[in-house]
């Protein structure tokens, strides 16, 4: 299977150029653009010896499937994204803060989760290989550059990964509406992996059984549920808030 894939949009491509330029194979930029963002891509691509083509909008529309490409598309070597979970854990300077997505298959949701994970300083996003969205151009665009900097680790056996994390001293907190413990009465300041289930289905039974604790997000309005990326942002933000308070 080819490791090449397309990404589009200035956020995603600039993140690649600055964070992982060797993963860029070539870039296509809309002709006639002389704005600062286009110039920044031109200059950085030249500095990193990344092949760049000036093409018309129709070519970019065709390449991106008429997505909102903002006038720039790139081909990347996705194999250079590979990150091992053990490497992530071994190189941290603070207790792990992880986001685990169990059955999130929508690329827009994955992109939004990566974006909030980056904003809240999560060290990695983990998902099972067989029931998850894959990194693609849509994910990269929605993530606004976060897909290029937050490790997205897919695992063959999520239950085994949860056991390995426990052995490494990481507490596993699953989120569910039925939990007795709520987010604002839970100590989320230590080494922690938040587990989010698929919208409408929640966590799978085996995943739930591997959680150390189940936590609910208090709801004070009329809506009964939240988008998975919104929920992810809330729990990660609470972990960060508690860590700041604990540090004094």
Curated annotation (Swiss-Prot):
Cited HAMAP family: 23SrRNA_methyltr_B
GO molecular-function annotation terms? RNA binding; rRNA (guanosine-2'-O-)-methyltransferase activity
Q: Does the keyword Magnesium apply?
A: no
Keywords attached to this entry = Cytoplasm, Methyltransferase, rRNA processing, S-adenosyl-L-methionine, Transferase
Family, according to the entry, reads as follows: Belongs to the class IV-like SAM-binding methyltransferase superfamily. RNA methyltransferase TrmH family. RlmB subfamily.
- Catalyzed reaction equations: guanosine(2251) in 23S rRNA + S-adenosyl-L-methionine = 2'-O-methylguanosine(2251) in 23S rRNA + S-adenosyl-L-homocysteine + H(+)
Q: Does the keyword rRNA processing apply?
A: yes
Protein name per Swiss-Prot or TrEMBL: 23S rRNA (guanosine-2'-O-)-methyltransferase RlmB
A GO term from the CC aspect = cytosol
Q: Which PANTHER family match?
A: 23S RRNA (GUANOSINE-2'-O-)-METHYLTRANSFERASE RLMB
Organism of derivation: Chromobacterium violaceum (strain ATCC 12472 / DSM 30191 / JCM 1249 / CCUG 213 / NBRC 12614 / NCIMB 9131 / NCTC 9757 / MK)
